[in-house]
Swiss-Prot record:
Keywords for the protein's UniProt record, in alphabetical order: Guanine-nucleotide releasing factor, Phosphoprotein
Domain of life: Eukaryota
Oligomeric form and interacting partners: Interacts with CCZ1. Found in a complex with RMC1, CCZ1, MON1A and MON1B. The MON1A-CCZ1B complex interacts with RIMOC1. The MON1A-CCZ1B complex interacts with RAB7A and this interaction is enhanced in the presence of RIMOC1.
PANTHER family: SAND PROTEIN-RELATED, VACUOLAR FUSION PROTEIN MON1 HOMOLOG A
Residue positions where Phosphoserine is found in the record: S31, S56, S91
One record GO biological process: protein secretion
Phosphothreonine: modified positions: T61
InterPro entries in alphabetical order: FUZ/MON1/HPS1_longin_1, FUZ/MON1/HPS1_longin_2, FUZ/MON1/HPS1_longin_3, Mon1
Pfam families registered for this protein in UniProt: Fuz_longin_1, Fuz_longin_2, Fuz_longin_3
GO cellular component, one term: Mon1-Ccz1 complex
Name of the protein in question: Vacuolar fusion protein MON1 homolog A
Family listed: Belongs to the MON1/SAND family.
Bias (Basic and acidic residues) ranges: 1-12
Gene that this sequence comes from: MON1A
Length: 555
């Protein structure tokens, strides 16, 4: 398997300065611990690798054409060709699109009227979904207005359409009701490409509109969030890879070569819950932001026993054996010289968490790992060790006829766990799947994210008060996204950032070896935050064999 090649990014350039657009204070700072040598950071002691070697966010988000989608142009690089004289027409078209996004009620009502074109009718089991409940008798008009108002209030919308303009997926509302909006989007893309230009993002009226084209699909995000265009593009790539995981790239290309206006919803019928779940995970799980996997906190001896049991319970067709719990990695064993990409692992996590049916027995399902091989299917054996636990066992096989051999691997794995006493230790670990930030012993520290780039793993404590509600948790992740986008700005990256807000202060520190994001009380000072870094890094180092997989095994 070809691994992603590491590139020397513009992050080696001197730090730039960015002016806050939200009224909060953001400062650059010198390296908090200049004496920390690369290779000595927590997590760097991993013996061997589990994932595709990618040490930077840019490596993980690099697209197949060699450029990170949504990147801003590098300083000193030649700019894009002059825009066509018809740019006024493009602006006018976007104004119409913006009008639809902020005043979509009329369009939705017209599209939902009887007598709409049959080209946009749902096939059996289509993925279209109403934005809200159906209107009640006697109040249809008022309820339709409420539904469209609720649609407009969402902070982020995601649309997928074919290059021919056929709707494939929309995060909210039905695809038919939004067909005119999607038509404007594909018209903008096609208009610019006719002049050998490519549209990547538009910023207007408080919105970011980000386009990612992966022929034969066009993916669009419309957001009013703190995320950068680059991060929104990465989320769209996840959606694209999610579609590939269900169809394979070869099948997708073949379909549209045969019929350019094919309605892809016929093949994706019923899969919208998987895509919905992926978007929900990206809104609250920092794994996607960090481009890494989080491990279940576990004693090193227990984890080594689990890994050895997975290694010994193998079949000739197996490529990966994975034990996970609540989207946290417990153990991963891979075939020698075969490496999993974090994006593929996230897609597997999403597949499992999107359906409760996997708890009912042993499942055998085809799955494409698009970053490993987008051309074909593997077959995944998915089962929970016990119905009442969150321990899920995943075997990835190359042989679709090997179900019974792989099922026997599951039986042998469970036997070894019980004989070695690891089964009870795992159940005990699941009682506290997250550790408390209070264990670090830093009074003002509320939360943190720490990623070891060499291992592809990150760690973070449980999100606790004052971030107890779902809204507050998403707001905290939004702050991390804000710092992350500034640290990874393609034209002027920042290595250290200090952020002060009304409810919390944050500090970001990004190096070639690790990334650290800290959230602490607004009463804390910058000096105390820098001082806390030393203590936090020492604590993570002391606990690294519990928080990271340091001895990964192979077949």
């Amino acid at each position: 398997m070809a691994a992603d090649m590491q590139r020397k990014r513009s992050s080696e350039c001197p730090d730039g300065t960015l002016t806050p657009s939200d009224g909060h204070s953001v400062e650059r700072a010198e390296s908090p611990t200049p004496g920390l040598a690369q290779g000595m950071e927590p997590g760097a002691g991993q013996e061997g690798a589990m994932f595709v070697h990618a040490r930077s966010y840019e490596d993980l988000t690099e697209s197949e054409d060699g450029a990170a989608s949504g990147d801003s142009p590098k300083e000193g690089a030649r700019g894009p060709p002059p825009l066509p004289a018809d740019m006024r027409q493009i602006s006018q078209d976007f104004s119409e699109l913006s009008t639809q996004l902020t005043g979509v009620a009329r369009d939705l009502q017209e599209e939902m009227l009887p007598g709409s074109s049959e080209d946009w009718l749902d096939p059996p089991g289509a993925v279209g979904r109403p934005a809200t409940e159906p209107p009640r008798e006697g109040t249809a008009e008022g309820d339709e207005e409420d539904a469209t108002e609720a649609w407009r209030l969402h902070q982020k919308h995601v649309f997928v359409l074919s290059e021919a303009g056929k709707p494939v997926y929309s995060r909210y509302g039905s695809e038919e009701a939004l067909s005119s909006t999607m038509g404007v989007m594909v018209a903008l893309v096609s208009f610019l490409e006719a002049d050998k230009n490519a549209i990547r993002s538009i910023h207007a009226d408080g919105y970011k509109v980000v386009f990612v084209r992966r022929s034969p699909l066009v993916l669009v995000a419309v957001a009013r969030t703190r995320q950068s265009a680059q991060e929104l593009a990465q989320e769209l790539l996840y959606i694209y890879y999610q579609i590939l995981s269900l169809l394979t790239g070869a099948q997708l290309s073949h379909i549209f070569q045969q019929k350019q206006n094919y309605d892809l919803r016929r093949l994706l019928s019923g899969s919208e819950r998987i895509t919905d779940n992926l978007l929900q995970l990206m809104a609250r799980d920092p794994s996607f932001l960090m481009g890494a996997a989080r491990c279940l906190p576990l004693a090193a001896a227990v984890r080594d026993t689990v890994s050895a049991s997975l290694q010994q319970a193998r079949a000739r067709s197996l490529v990966f054996s994975i034990l996970l719990a609540r989207n946290q990695l417990v153990a991963l064993v891979r075939r020698k010289d075969q490496f999993l990409h974090p994006i593929d692992l996230h897609l597997l996590f999403n597949l499992i968490s999107s359906s409760s049916s996997f708890r009912e027995g042993e499942a055998w399902t085809p799955v494409c790992l698009p970053k490993f091989n987008a051309a074909g299917f593997f077959h995944a054996h998915i089962s929970y060790l016990e119905p009442d636990t969150d321990l899920c066992l995943l075997f990835v096989s190359t042989d679709r006829e090997d179900f019974f051999a792989v099922s026997d691997c599951r039986r042998r794995f469970q036997e070894r766990l019980r004989k070695r006493g690891a089964h009870l230790a795992l159940r005990e670990a699941l009682r506290t799947p997250y550790y408390s930030v209070a264990q670090v012993g830093i009074p003002d520290l509320r939360h943190f994210l720490y990623k070891s780039k060499s291992s592809g793993l990150f760690t973070s404590p449980e999100i606790e008060a004052p971030y107890t509600s779902e809204e507050e948790q998403e707001r905290l992740l939004g702050l991390y996204q804000y710092l992350h986008s500034r640290a990874h700005n393609a034209s002027r990256p920042l290595k250290t950032i200090y952020y002060t807000g009304p409810n919390e202060n944050l500090l970001a520190w990004v190096t070639g070896a690790f990334e650290l994001y800290m959230c602490y009380s607004p009463l804390g000072t910058k000096a105390s935050a820098v001082s806390a870094i030393h203590k936090l890094m020492r604590w993570i180092r002391k606990e690294e064999d519990r928080l990271f997989i340091l001895t990964p095994l192979t077949y």
